[in-house]
Amino acid sequence: MMHPDTELRYINDEIGYGVFATKFIPKGTIVWAQDNLDQVLDPVFVERLDSLRKQDVQKYSFKNQFGKYILCWDKARYVNHSFHANCVPTMYDLELAARDVLPGEELTDDYGTLNLDEPFDCLPESDTDRSRVMPDDLLRYYPQWDRIAAEAFQRFNHVEQPLLHLISPKHLETIRGITEQRLAIDSVIHLYCRSQWQTRQQWKT
């Protein structure tokens, strides 16, 4: 579920819709948490879908570390990509605000964290040499995302957390240890799931 202080807005014909903050969301706030309304789909099931449904599942879902497709039930499926994302993933089925998000600002993810099935060509952005999201970006950029997440967790206990009740019980003690600085975060490199595209590339070489 997305943070309640967000809304869906139309951007333009090229991008489509995006998710925007309606109020100030401070750094360290849970901006998304996986909950029991999200669909968890087996890749074999997705592969057997008709082409129309399969196309939409692959467009609006992401893959977890177990290769399962996570299809969010709410506006979370419309979060767009940025190489300077203001949301950062964790190993705990939630994302945090990587920095303060201002009212009217779009919430974004770096799609490199989402285990894409295929490379994803992006709109140009300043201050980055990246122009394409690759299925194995987690293997390249995990230290950067770990650092951002660790810094965000330092603010976790100092901000309001409307989605706190959605944290999975299996993660509660670990998150408590992180926020109390007794534990280090688990690296998001463990979110990585090898894609069929990468397997095909390996066979080509």
Language-model regions: role of each:
Residues 1-45, 81-92, 191-205:
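Conserved AWS/pre-SET-to-SET junction and N-terminal core of the SET lysine methyltransferase domain
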Residues 1-12, 51-124, 129:
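Catalytic core of the SET domain in histone-lysine N-methyltransferases
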Residues 1-4, 13, 114, 118-205:
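Non-catalytic accessory regions of eukaryotic chromatin regulators
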Residues 18-20, 30, 69, 114, ...:
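Compositionally biased, intrinsically disordered low-complexity regions
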Residues 20, 24, 45, 62, ...:
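Phenylalanine-focused residue identity feature
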Residues 21, 33, 76, 85, ...:
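A sequence-composition feature that detects small, non-aromatic residues
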Residues 35, 41, 46-47, 95, ...:
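Generic preference for flexible, low-structure residues
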Residues 50-81, 134-164:
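Active-site-adjacent segment of 2-oxoglutarate/Fe(II) JmjC oxygenases
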